[in-house]
């Protein structure tokens, strides 16, 4: 399998306090009937449209690289008008001397359940990814770049060809870190199963079929660090 994080150079709201060392702002997908609030809504909608387009372009290239009969088959999940995608802003305040060591973990080890994540941050380090041997490496920050993180759903769609990237956020700087993630997800009733082109006699179906709604319910019933895609793996095949 391939575990991948790509760095790219580029050109309603609910506030949830998850812990004293991380705060986040969630923005749900755009709904026409929701009142749009001036410059903020315009800026967010423009940003979401841009990163959504970027994500779809990347997934189309993935489809071409995998020689899928329809290179848009994965990106169509995100283009769907009922896509469950959303935008999140994370704020990691710099720790103070009295904070316990556990506060150095801004967000614990996990993989994202969605298809992929488009991440951008300021110039403060903190993002780390887990290598196949279990070691952790820091991802150098670059505020002029987007980072593309493979999620569990893409792992299932590609029958394990691409693997969800386990990552975490470390609060180790004397400066505040901020990041923005666009989580690209299918509609709740979108049916996820290994694409036929990714299945062969030597690589049988390795994941059970599920809807995105079913996966969300199963995934969020487990602890953050749990390998949640394992719930749908066919162990004899993967």
Each language-model region and where it sits:
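Peripheral, non-catalytic segments flanking oxidoreductase cores
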Residues: 1-238
């Amino acid at each position: 399998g391939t575990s991948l994080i790509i760095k790219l150079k580029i050109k309603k709201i609910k506030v949830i306090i998850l812990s004293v060392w991380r705060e986040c702002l969630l923005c749900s997908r755009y709904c026409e009937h929701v009142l749009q609030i001036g410059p903020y809504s315009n800026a967010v909608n423009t940003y979401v449209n841009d990163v959504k387009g970027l994500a779809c372009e990347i997934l189309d290239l993935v489809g071409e690289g995998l020689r899928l009969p329809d290179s848009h088959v994965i990106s169509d999940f995100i283009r769907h008008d009922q896509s469950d995608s959303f935008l999140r802003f994370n704020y990691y305040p710099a720790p103070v001397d009295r904070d316990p060591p556990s506060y150095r973990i801004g967000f614990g080890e996990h993989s994202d359940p969605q298809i992929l994540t488009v991440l951008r941050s300021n110039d403060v380090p903190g993002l780390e990814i887990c290598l196949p041997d279990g070691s952790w490496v820091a991802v150098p920050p670059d505020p002029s770049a987007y980072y593309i993180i493979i999620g569990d759903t893409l792992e299932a769609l590609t029958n394990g060809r691409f693997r969800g990237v386990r990552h975490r956020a470390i609060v180790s700087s004397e400066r505040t870190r901020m990041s923005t993630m666009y989580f690209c997800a299918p509609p709740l009733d979108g049916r996820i199963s290994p694409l036929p082109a990714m299945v062969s006699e030597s690589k049988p179906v390795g994941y059970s079929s599920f809807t995105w709604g079913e996966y969300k319910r199963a995934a969020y019933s487990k602890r953050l660090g749990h390998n949640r895609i394992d719930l749908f793996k066919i162990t004899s095949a993967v």
